[in-house]
Amino acid sequence: MYTLDFDAVIIGGGMTGLAMAGQLGGLGLKTAIVEKQIPEPYHPTQNFDLRVSALSPQSFKMLEKIGAWEHIENMRFCPYRQMRVWEMRGFGDVTFEAAKIGEPYLGYIVENRIVQLALLE
């Protein structure tokens, strides 16, 4: 009988599962990821995906620490300097601006699939 031995098994190879696997791997833990679908490979002429995430500076630091950010840089991303959030049927809204906190950017907009591909590297 063949036995597999892992310190951790992660169910789901989305951005969160893959980021966790990267962090656990950085701690020297042997990690398995269970996922039924691998993201479509990246090609620069592809249309942009509709599913994107606004990555905060902390997310950027984590991706940089586990070696994924350099792969994102080789694909595509876009820094954002301002973000407005509002209620669809309400009157509340808030605007965040990088310049008001003395930063060049608030974070980066990245297609979710590109984050996944970078984490798989």
Tell me what each language-model feature is.
Residues 9, 37, 113:
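Anionic group-transfer/hydrolysis microenvironments
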